[in-house]
């Protein structure tokens, strides 16, 4: 008889692009270059629901917990 204790594996993906069909961007929230759009940062951030990093991409932190 072989005894195998339960193993737990924690997988963390700190930066994972959101998948909304094409390009991983939320609908209506495409990246806007700072040279083209010179609005205040507060106005640009208020236009999208998800937080935007410095590159204009929307990211979601996803953690997975697997138990075997």
From Swiss-Prot:
GO biological process: axon regeneration; regulation of neuron differentiation; regulation of transforming growth factor beta receptor signaling pathway
Protein name per its UniProtKB record: Neuronal regeneration-related protein
InterPro entries (UniProt xref): Neuronal_3.1
Pfam families named in the record: Alveol-reg_P311
Coiled-coil segments: none
């Amino acid at each position: 008889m072989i005894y195998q204790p339960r193993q737990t594996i924690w997988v963390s993906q700190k930066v994972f692009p959101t998948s909304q069909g094409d390009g991983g961007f939320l609908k209506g929230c495409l990246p806007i270059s700072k040279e083209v759009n010179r609005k205040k940062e507060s106005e640009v951030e208020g236009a999208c629901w998800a937080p935007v990093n410095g590159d204009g991409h929307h990211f979601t932190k996803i953690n997975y917990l697997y138990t075997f």
